[in-house]
Amino acid sequence: YETLKEADYNTAGGYYNAAVNRLYYACYYAASALLLNCEIEANTHYGVKTQLSMHFVRTGHLSLDHGATFSLLFEKRQASDYSDFAYCDLALVNTLRPRAEAFINAMEQLINKE
């Protein structure tokens, strides 16, 4: 949950692109932990997204909403890190923050089931 705190810190400072980056990484770390716990290999960020979808969303173990949250954060992080004209605002961060926390909680629940 430290990475969520980093997102909050960046949000408070007005660094919304950085906040979205930290929200993504908080979810990425949680998703990676789930995959590792289940001995599912993923070597890239795209691989984590693909494996999560294939093994958990498509099988119904993870809601479509959580899958969509991770995909949206993946896209926003890509854009904010690699595009010259990407702009995240407070409204976006405020929308994504609770969704990211819910995603992380879902990862934790799935890990504890295994």
Locate predicted features:
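Terminal alpha-helical segments
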Residues: 1-114
